[in-house]
């Protein structure tokens, strides 16, 4: 399993909307990808209130894929590309991390 996390900070205004509206639109557009992309096991989207803290993101994506191949297929999927183009227009920053989780790993064995 591959976990894919992305955090965005958004522009105050973009695409004719304020930041709060664009946050909601991103959430809706990402959630609409559920069931469209093979290998996408889980997708959650969170939006932050109205923080001006420069260290805090505005939108976070947490997703799980069956494999790296599935993650690559997601990246090139036409439905994802449409959402990504919108996000690129309204985001000012993006941070991403992808990491592999093995079945043998469990919360009780997590490093401290």
Q: What are these model-predicted stretches?
A:
Residues 68-97:
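C-terminal structural segments of small proteins and small subunits
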Residues 1-57, 66-73, 99-112:
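Short S/T/G/P-rich N-terminal loop/turn motif that feeds into the first structured element of a domain
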